[in-house]
Amino acid sequence: INFGAIKAILKKWGKKLVEYALKHKDLYAPYIKKHLCEKL
């Protein structure tokens, strides 16, 4: 894995990804909750 490339992508798109994630959190929040509950 090229971490430099990942950092560059995150630097460029990080804000957009965060905005998108917040806008669509209802799509993945139940999945994350289920996943976390299974791990705990």
From Swiss-Prot:
<comment type="similarity">
    <text>Belongs to the ectatomin family. Ectatomin-Eq subfamily.</text>
</comment>
<keyword id="KW-1053">Target membrane</keyword>
<keyword id="KW-0472">Membrane</keyword>
<keyword id="KW-1052">Target cell membrane</keyword>
<keyword id="KW-0800">Toxin</keyword>
<protein>
    <recommendedName>
        <fullName>U1-ectatotoxin-Eb1a subunit A</fullName>
    </recommendedName>
</protein>
<dbReference type="GO" id="GO:0044218">
    <property type="term" value="C:other organism cell membrane"/>
</dbReference>
<dbReference type="GO" id="GO:0005576">
    <property type="term" value="C:extracellular region"/>
</dbReference>
<keyword id="KW-0964">Secreted</keyword>
<comment type="subunit">
    <text>Heterodimer of subunits A and B; disulfide-linked.</text>
</comment>
<keyword id="KW-1015">Disulfide bond</keyword>
<dbReference type="GO" id="GO:0016020">
    <property type="term" value="C:membrane"/>
</dbReference>
<dbReference type="GO" id="GO:0090729">
    <property type="term" value="F:toxin activity"/>
</dbReference>
